[in-house]
Amino acid sequence: MFPKFKFPFLKKSFKQKVLATTELTTTFSYQERPEYTRIIAGAGWKYHWTNKNNMTRHVLDLVDLNYVYLPKSRSNFLDSISNPLLRYSYEDHFILRAGYVYYHTNKLPSNGYRQRFQSDFYTFRAGVETAGNFLYGMSKLFGQKKRDDGSYRVFDINYSQYIKGEIDYTYTHRFSPRHMVAFHSGFGIGIPYGNSTILPFEKRFYAGGANGVRGWSVRTLGPGAFRGNNSVTNFINQCGDIRLDFNMEYRAKLFWVLELGAFIDAGNIWTIKEYDNQPDGVFKFDKFYKQIALAYGLGLRFDFTYFLIRLDLGMKAHNPAKGEEPWPIFHPNWSRDSAIHFSVGYPF
């Protein structure tokens, strides 16, 4: 990381008004599952800049390249994925993308008396990324022939092409230094096009988990009214192209580092088109509101100033999955309707 812009043509006056860094990154991820082994290697060049009070921040991913490689998979793993669109997410592919993230808050800096008693503050985050356009343009320019499935390849490897956007807004009201309530709403959508017919698995949205609808474990909710019934491929099918989240959380400081949280979560994910392995998962304006999952729960937090440890217990209130009890809030079953989450930091 360089403590200034490594970018030509920028005026000196602009560089003096902002706090900026240039970041060169390399990443390596190794994932071992019973069904497959996956390796993701990447490199990127990005810029960060913020105003002097750190209330507005920008991140520009100028270029980010990831290579997803599956050296081995269980013999029946890909065979169990009958939908060829989902199979694509578990084959070797490139992701060459660019993106931009904007972040703004009116929350005052933490050093000072005013911050401790600021009654209302908000944060807003919006991001967009796109992938595959440069490679697709080069394929067209040099007259590369498409494969039988209608896609281009680079070094005989597929590359993804899509656009994806996300917006999140959080508002917090303090009743006193020890009591507050926080509201969060979020929306995201990803659309494949050109060289892709589906988003790569690592770019699709998922629901449930410590930062989602906490009545469900991660990747066990949605899309839509879809109900998973195959333990081998559930984690593949329970992801989507659209996400919608609403959360409300009351937070109270008890004593020492201990805090209490009470929350209500709502949301789900959907696909933008019909997939054979995700029935009832597509987003429809006349149905999506009926497929919004609801959860409630309590949590304990340990605030050590520099980091916070969180333990939440969530319970299902409304389950949109077909064939399940639709309103478990009236007939709760602990083993069926509860989920425990351990995480670091607030959910929003």
Residue ranges and their predicted role:
Residues 244-252, 260, 266, 293-304, ...:
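Conserved C-terminal beta-signal and adjacent last beta-strands/turns
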Residues 2, 278-304:
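Strand-loop-strand
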Residues 1, 58-252, 262-285:
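C-terminal outer-membrane beta-barrel translocator/porin domains of Gram-negative envelope proteins
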